[in-house]
UniProtKB/Swiss-Prot annotation:
It comes from Xenopus laevis (African clawed frog). Induction: By derriere. Sequence-specific transcription factor which is part of a developmental regulatory system that provides cells with specific positional identities on the anterior-posterior axis. CDD domains: homeodomain. The gene is hoxb9. This is Homeobox protein Hox-B9. It is found in: Nucleus. PANTHER family: AGAP004664-PA (PTHR45970), HOMEOBOX PROTEIN HOX-B9 (PTHR45970:SF5). GO terms for cellular component: nucleus. The lineage of its organism: Eukaryota, Metazoa, Chordata, Craniata, Vertebrata. GO terms for biological process: anterior/posterior pattern specification; DNA-templated transcription; embryonic skeletal system morphogenesis; proximal/distal pattern formation; regulation of transcription by RNA polymerase II.
Amino acid sequence: MAISGPLTNYFVQSIISPDTDETPAAKFSAQFPNPRAPAQSEPLDFPSCSFSASWNFLTPHPPVYQPYIQQQQQQEEGAPSAEGRYLRAWLDNGPSLKSEPLLGPPGDKLGPQHYTVASPGGAAANTERSTHSGNFPDTKGTEGTAGETDRTHQNNPSANWLHARSSRKKRCPYSKYQTLELEKEFKFNMYLTRDRRHEVARLLNLSERQVKIWFQNRRMKMKKLNKDQSKD
């Protein structure tokens, strides 16, 4: 028995339950509720964030030695050492250079400029000086003081070794009479015996050692003269 087309559609629709019209996703959503739904419906309560302006304006050129001093202060917060105090004092009391103007009235010739170094505490005590080519200092007083200093240097050997003078007398152990008598004795005999040396020393008011040394020196002098004559 053959069934026509409209009838077959009717029977197929009657067999399939009316629930089939719904989508599978709707079925599963009805059986298992989505736990994220209430979470999405509730508003999220987060504390409000407020950012304060904690960053200060940074200067492009930091002060000199500032990082080194800050590092020292961080390392030694309790009791700063003597080196740190000296460094800070040196930085605080640094000298400042004050320059004079280089330009003057028209027609004046500028001479050498002098600069004064003034510290922050005693800047008022320092006076500025400028000298021009037309001004000449008085040299009379300076010449007198220079002569006096030269005399003091000459009198004081320790002041200047160029002007040092020995306070010892010139070495002259033998008088003219003693030298003449010793020369006579040397002509008679180049070598003295002990007794003769004792006698000569007694006659000339000398010691035996002085007589002995004189004869030794005289013999060396004669040998040198003979050697020079033989070379000539």
